[in-house]
A protein has these predicted regions:
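Extracellular Ig-like/FN3 beta-sandwich strand-entry sites
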Residues: 234, 292-294
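Solvent-exposed loop and edge beta-strand segments that line ligand/cofactor-binding
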Residues: 2-52, 69-78, 82-102, 156-168
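Well-ordered alpha-helical scaffold segments within catalytic/enzyme domains
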Residues: 36-51, 89, 93, 104-117, ...
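Long, well-ordered core segments of solenoidal/helical folds
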Residues: 1-11, 56-73, 127-138
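C-terminal beta-rich recognition modules with glycine/proline-rich loops and embedded aromatic residues
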Residues: 57, 123-131, 136-229, 246-269, ...
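Short, solvent-exposed positions on alpha-helices
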Residues: 51-55, 119-123
Length: 425
């Protein structure tokens, strides 16, 4: 059996049983199993107040967040074993990032937050939720991704079903549980973790509190929360200030914003600004609440350029674009010219943002101001964009033509070889 080496099972990093958990400091093996395992370990450490065990799982989490986390919140870089590679192995065209692994990452980060009250875990949870996880299902709800590569040389599309059909059922189950991630309660502390419109009734001590949240987040940073206790009562409301609003895309140096300015954040109670008092990434509002109280959170959402740690060699010369918690992808289906995207040094400004209901219902499209080349390699779609002056030998053009003429190799080998020729592997 796993962990015991019985019934013919060999202890291995694949199953995370190559050494006792208390001695581990790197996340290895099958990504989904790792996320589920360490979710359970976090629970056990919390329930048993086992500091050594929690320190071990926190070391593993730090390794994941600082060396093995994709910008979209996905985990698991290797198709082989559906798992992790060495530190900083974050390739873009041949990565795996299974949908189930993103779900497991949400589970794990939620438990790490519950054990500590630290918002950094919710920052990773939110990034994964809005990018790596939700991409696993189509807007129509009937097609799914098993793996989620950051880029593809064409041909990678959502499927209606899989021989190993863990992801469709898992993502369906998860979507129904999202309301449970919005708030958390610890005695007289109420945490506002996610910004999602809706009504919730919470039990805070012996007081029933109704919270009505109104927002269009993540499309803008305006949030209103109506607080209605059934009686006047003193308790603390902790409103999370997301990492992206504090000039930090992830809680490590794995990714940083090129544009160094901090978005402006304001918190008002009944129209009056509150004195800034933070705890573990939360804006703390301690007061006696009464019916009719309203909390207003406003966060600027500039377009941000993101670069990876220099040790991620696959991302050298590359930038990503984000706005708020959303990582943007380039739509390239109508880009007929074989060319590269180029971003200049000056900040990028958003010109407008809209929903094209006739095309894809709830999907939002953004247009950008400023000098930039908007053409792309036909058939490619990648979340990262190339900076000017990098790989000017036309290798991307020749690689693509070579792929189109290849008829005997499998898709995965084509993708892998293309990445190697382009310098991404």
């Amino acid at each position: 059996e796993t962990g015991r080496g019985t019934d013919g099972h060999k202890l291995s990093p694949y199953s995370q049983d190559h050494k006792p958990i208390i001695d581990q400091d790197e996340i290895v093996g099958h990504a989904v199993r790792a996320g589920y395992l360490f979710s359970g370990v976090t629970d056990v450490a919390s329930l048993q107040h086992d500091k050594k065990l929690f320190d071990a799982v926190n070391r593993v989490w730090e390794n994941m967040a600082s060396k093995k986390l994709y910008l979209n919140g996905g985990i698991g870089s290797r198709p082989q074993g559906e798992g992790f590679g060495p530190n900083y192995e974050l390739n873009n065209f041949n990565n795996y990032c299974e949908t189930c692994a993103s779900i497991a990452n949400v589970y794990w980060n939620q438990r790490m937050f519950l054990a500590t009250g630290d918002s950094k875990y919710i920052d990773v949870l939110e990034r994964t939720l809005y990018n790596g996880l939700i991409a696993g299902v189509s807007l129509s709800g009937d097609k799914f991704f098993y793996d989620n590569p950051m880029g593809t040389p064409g041909g990678h599309a959502r499927q209606q079903w899989f021989g190993c059909a863990c992801c469709p059922g898992n993502v369906t189950r998860f979507m129904a549980s999202v309301p449970g991630y919005v708030y958390a309660i610890d005695k007289k502390d109420v945490y506002v973790n996610l910004f999602v419109g809706g009504n919730s009734k919470l039990k805070v001590g012996d007081t029933e509190v109704e919270l009505v949240q109104k927002t269009q987040y993540p499309w803008n940073g305006d949030v209103e929360i109506d607080v209605t206790p059934n009686k006047n009562d003193k308790f603390t409301l902790l409103v999370r200030i997301p990492g992206w609003a504090k000039n930090r895309p992830v809680p490590s140096d794995l990714y940083t914003y090129v544009d160094g300015s901090n978005p402006q954040v304001k918190v008002l109670v009944n129209g009056s600004e509150t004195k800034k008092h933070t705890r573990a990434g939360y804006w703390v509002i301690e007061r006696e609440w009464k019916k009719g109280d309203k909390v207003t959170l406003t966060m600027d959402m500039p377009v941000r350029r993101v670069e990876a740690n220099p040790q991620v060699r696959y991302d050298k010369g590359m930038l990503a674009m984000e706005r708020g918690p959303i990582l943007n992808a380039l739509e390239c289906k109508d880009q007929k010219r074989e060319n590269r995207v180029s971003l200049r040094k000056e900040p990028v400004k958003r010109s407008r943002s809209s929903r094209r209901k006739c095309l894809c219902r709830r999907k939002r499209f953004c247009q950008w101001k400023g000098n930039r080349k908007a053409s792309y390699i036909q058939g490619y779609s990648i979340l990262y964009m190339e900076q000017p002056g990098y790989r000017t030998d036309g290798s991307m053009d020749s690689c693509y033509k070579r792929i189109r003429n290849s008829k005997t190799r499998t898709y995965n080998s084509i993708r892998s070889n293309a990445c190697r020729r382009m310098g991404f592997q």
